[in-house]
Structure formats: structure tokens, C-alpha cells
């Protein structure tokens, strides 16, 4: 149980450190999604927190609030997909 156990413990510690570094890196990154040809723009960070939202006044129609709701949803989905794509690349490079 001597050197084999110590080696596995060291590998686990290295993987934990790599994971923490990846997590910290993601927190600093921003991913943007747009909808309606830029009428709505949402920026999220790697923790999926919304960093900013921009709305062009031309898409605000009090008679049809569902339009803006759909645009927000689409913009957020696009930003999340960009984040997920990068995250999957990062995960693929991890040794575990």
C-alpha cells in the first residue's frame, strides 16, 4: 500500500488543483448571446451569472411583451451554449 497509494493521492491532489484552476478561469470568462439581430444581448460568466443585458428600445412593444421574453430566452441560450462548448473542450483536456 506504500508508494502506489501515495502516487494515487498525489494524482488526486493534482486533479483537484486542475479543477480549481479551471473553475477560476471560467469565472473570469464572459460569453455573449444575441437575439433578433442584436436587439437583445446578454453576457454571462462561466458560472452562468448574468453580467450584462442590453436591449434596443425598438424591440420594446407594450402590446406584445412575449417578443422581448422570447428574445431574452434566445440570447441567454446562445450565451450558455457558447460557455458549454468551451467547458466541454476544457473537460476533454483533463486527465480524468
Curated annotation (Swiss-Prot):
Its main location: cytoplasm. GO terms for cellular component: bacterial nucleoid; cytosol. Pfam families: YbaB_DNA_bd (PF02575). Keywords: Cytoplasm, DNA-binding. The keyword Cytoplasm applies. It is found in: Cytoplasm, Nucleoid. Gene3D superfamilies: Nucleoid-associated protein YbaB-like domain (3.30.1310.10). One of its GO terms (molecular function) is DNA binding. InterPro entries: YbaB-like_sf, YbaB/EbfC. PANTHER family: NUCLEOID-ASSOCIATED PROTEIN YBAB (PTHR33449:SF1). Homodimer. Binds to DNA and alters its conformation. May be involved in regulation of gene expression, nucleoid organization and DNA protection. HAMAP family: DNA_YbaB_EbfC. Belongs to the YbaB/EbfC family. This is Nucleoid-associated protein CAB326. It comes from Chlamydia abortus (strain DSM 27085 / S26/3) (Chlamydophila abortus). The lineage of its organism: Bacteria, Pseudomonadati, Chlamydiota, Chlamydiia, Chlamydiales.
Amino acid at each position: 500500500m506504500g508508494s502506489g497509494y501515495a502516487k494515487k493521492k498525489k494524482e488526486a491532489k493534482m486533479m483537484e488543483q486542475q479543477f480549481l484552476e479551471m473553475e477560476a478561469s471560467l469565472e473570469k470568462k464572459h460569453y455573449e448571446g444575441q437575439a433578433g439581430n442584436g436587439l437583445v444581448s446578454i453576457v454571462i460568466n462561466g458560472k452562468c451569472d448574468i453580467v450584462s443585458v442590453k436591449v434596443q428600445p425598438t424591440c420594446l412593444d407594450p402590446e406584445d411583451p412575449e417578443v422581448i421574453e422570447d428574445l431574452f430566452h434566445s440570447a441567454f441560450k446562445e450565451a450558455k451554449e457558447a460557455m458549454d462548448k468551451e467547458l466541454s473542450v476544457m473537460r476533454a483536456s483533463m486527465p480524468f
